[in-house]
């Protein structure tokens, strides 16, 4: 085994603790996340976690207080911090408070699964998929000693340089499998 790919269940998915988007380890399935990641590292296994970031960061997430503070939001307000790809302050603080600490614990790369909106709400015609690939890849390029790696959907022309693409969710059938090479 070279790479362990963990889908959504690494984080809580039940209402009030998580959902499609989640940033807090599911302690029912992973009671000791650092130990789990450490074990994989000791056995030379790379790990990627699945992210569906579109719902932002809710107040029940473990890392919410630090992110809210850095975003100028009173943590007591319990206001969800929206995910806006074009918001440089948000992306910077998201990496600082949530993603980079998980990378330091042992996450090697991310499996992004953005599919909740074609365009950024603040920058006209900015493809969310294209830009999130760029943002994650650039952060890894800037802050790591290893070659950047990202698993995600193709965001359009030129985006191939940032991610290892996948076709997204697929129907389980021979016809669907026959079509996959075109991705």
Regions found by a protein language model. Name each.
Residues 1-183:
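Catalytic-domain carbohydrate-binding cleft regions of carbohydrate-active enzymes
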């Amino acid at each position: 085994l070279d790479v362990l790919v963990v889908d959504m269940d690494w984080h809580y998915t039940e209402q009030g603790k998580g959902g499609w988007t989640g940033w807090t380890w599911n302690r029912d399935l992973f009671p000791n996340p650092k130990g789990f990641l450490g074990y994989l590292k000791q056995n030379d296994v790379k790990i990627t976690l699945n992210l569906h970031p579109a719902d932002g960061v809710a107040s029940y997430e473990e890392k919410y207080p630090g992110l809210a503070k850095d975003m100028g939001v009173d943590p007591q307000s319990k206001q969800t911090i929206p995910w806006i790809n074009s918001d440089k302050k948000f992306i910077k603080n998201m990496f600082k408070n949530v993603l980079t600490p998980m990378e330091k614990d042992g996450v090697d790369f991310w499996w992004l699964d953005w599919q909740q909106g074609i365009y950024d709400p603040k920058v006209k015609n900015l493809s969310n998929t294209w830009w999130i690939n760029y943002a994650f890849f650039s952060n890894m390029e800037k802050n790591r000693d290893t070659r950047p790696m990202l698993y995600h959907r193709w965001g359009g022309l030129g985006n191939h340089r940032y991610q290892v693409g996948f076709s997204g969710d697929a129907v389980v059938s021979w016809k669907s499998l026959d079509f996959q090479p075109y991705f």
